[in-house]
């Protein structure tokens, strides 16, 4: 006989599925608002930012319109309270937005982070 206590079914880990894109099941722990912000940031980064970043590296330019677009979408100042013009979202939401922009370009993610945290 084993001296180890048996796990109750509710305490046993779910070994039935593994999602390599979300190994820690972060998505299950997010609020609806956090998921919406993440998805909006991902769509912007993939659909609007990525092609312009490729062109910017090739042509050695920066497109100032990107900063305005990110601001209009609320991607700058995610955690700043609404009464000051931000979204008033959580730091988890900020991290999710930063991760989606980082997937496309580290430079724009850095710019976004600086402008988002300047109020601290």
Put a short name on every predicted segment.
Residues 28-48:
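Mature N-terminal segment immediately following signal peptide/propeptide cleavage
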